[in-house]
C-alpha cells in the first residue's frame, strides 16, 4: 500500500516537470525598439502656468510668413494686427494693444510700439525662430504693460553639436511689388553658438481695384489705381552669440532695424 502511494507521487512530479519544460520552450523573446524621451526646462515651466499659452515654432512662422511678424501671427485666435501701410503693424491681444500688452525679444521688452498708432514693432520678421504668446494678465511676470498678455520672441537654442548652418529666404508680393530676402549664417562649436543675419525688403505703392475712394465723406481720386506715398523699404542686421556650459549661460544679441516708409495721405488728418 505504501509502495503504490510513493510511485504515484513520483509519477505526478515527473509529469508536472515535463509539462513545465514544454511551456518554457514555447515562449518567444521579442526585442522592442528604443524609446527616446525628451524634455526641456522651458516646456516644463510652461505647464505650470494657468494662463492660456501658445507656442509657435519655425515651421508655423514659415507657413504663414508675410514679411511682417504681427501679420504672421494674426491667424492666431485672439491676436489681431493693426496695419499702418505696408510695413508698420501693431499687435493686439483680445482687443487691447499699445501699453496694455508687452512684446519681449530675447528677454528685452520692446518699447517703441506703445507710443502711437504709427509706431510698429522694431523687429526683423526673418529673424524670429520661436514665439510664445500668453493671453491674460501677466503683469507680475512682465511688468505693468502686460495687462492683457505677452508676445515673447524666444532666442535660438543650441543643438549641442558642432555644425555650420545657414538659411536663405526670398519674399515677393504682387499687391505692392514687394521684393525681399534674408541671408543667415551660423556656427556652433563646443559651448558656443554664433549667428549673423542680414535682411532687406523693398516695396512700392499699394495697388487697389478702384479709381476713387471715399475718405471722411470726401471723394478722393486714386491715380493709376495706386495709393500714393505707401512705398518704402527696410534693412536689418543682427548678430547673436550664445554660450552654455554646465551651470553657466550667456546670451548676447545686437541688432539694427531701419525702416523708411510713407503713409497714405489722410492717414493723419484730412486728405489733401
Question: Which sequence ranges carry the predicted segments?
Answer:
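Short sequence motifs at beta-strands and strand-loop junctions characteristic
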Residues: 83-85, 143, 173-177, 225-234, ...
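Outer-envelope beta-barrel architecture signal
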Residues: 101, 162-166, 179, 190-194, ...
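Flexible loop and strand-edge segments within Gram-negative outer membrane beta-barrel domains
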Residues: 22, 228-234, 247-272
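Transmembrane beta-barrel strands of outer-membrane/channel proteins
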Residues: 168-174, 181, 187, 196-202, ...
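Short acidic/polar hinge/loop motifs at secondary-structure boundaries
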Residues: 108-135
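Structural signature of outer-membrane beta-barrel domains
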Residues: 42, 98, 110, 156, ...
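N-terminal periplasmic accessory domains that precede
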Residues: 69-72, 87-92, 104, 118-121, ...
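N-terminal periplasmic "start-of-domain" segments of outer-membrane beta-barrel proteins
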Residues: 33-62
Amino acid at each position: 500500500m505504501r509502495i503504490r502511494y510513493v510511485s504515484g507521487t513520483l509519477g505526478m512530479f515527473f509529469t508536472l516537470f515535463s509539462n513545465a519544460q514544454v511551456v518554457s520552450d514555447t515562449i518567444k523573446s521579442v526585442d522592442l525598439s528604443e524609446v527616446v524621451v525628451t524634455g526641456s526646462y522651458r516646456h516644463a515651466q510652461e505647464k505650470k502656468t494657468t494662463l492660456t499659452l501658445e507656442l509657435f515654432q519655425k515651421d508655423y512662422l514659415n507657413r504663414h510668413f508675410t514679411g511682417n511678424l504681427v501679420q504672421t501671427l494674426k491667424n492666431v485666435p485672439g491676436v489681431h494686427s493693426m496695419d499702418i501701410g505696408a510695413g508698420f503693424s501693431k499687435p493686439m491681444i483680445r482687443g487691447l494693444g499699445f501699453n496694455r500688452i508687452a512684446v519681449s525679444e530675447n528677454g528685452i521688452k520692446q518699447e517703441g510700439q506703445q507710443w502711437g498708432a504709427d509706431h510698429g514693432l522694431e523687429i526683423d520678421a526673418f529673424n524670429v525662430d520661436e514665439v510664445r504668446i500668453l493671453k491674460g494678465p501677466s503683469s507680475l511676470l512682465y511688468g505693468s504693460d502686460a495687462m492683457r498678455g505677452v508676445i515673447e520672441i524666444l532666442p535660438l537654442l543650441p543643438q549641442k553639436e558642432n555644425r555650420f548652418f545657414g538659411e536663405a529666404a526670398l519674399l515677393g508680393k504682387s499687391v505692392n511689388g514687394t521684393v525681399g530676402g534674408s541671408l543667415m549664417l551660423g556656427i556652433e562649436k563646443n559651448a558656443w553658438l554664433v549667428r549673423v543675419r542680414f535682411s532687406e525688403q523693398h516695396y512700392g505703392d499699394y495697388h487697389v481695384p478702384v479709381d476713387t475712394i471715399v475718405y471722411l465723406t470726401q471723394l478722393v481720386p486714386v491715380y493709376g489705381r495706386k495709393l500714393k506715398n505707401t512705398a518704402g523699404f527696410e534693412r536689418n542686421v543682427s548678430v547673436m552669440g550664445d554660450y552654455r556650459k554646465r551651470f553657466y549661460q550667456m546670451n548676447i544679441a545686437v541688432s539694427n532695424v531701419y525702416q523708411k516708409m510713407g503713409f497714405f495721405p489722410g492717414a493723419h488728418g484730412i486728405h489733401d
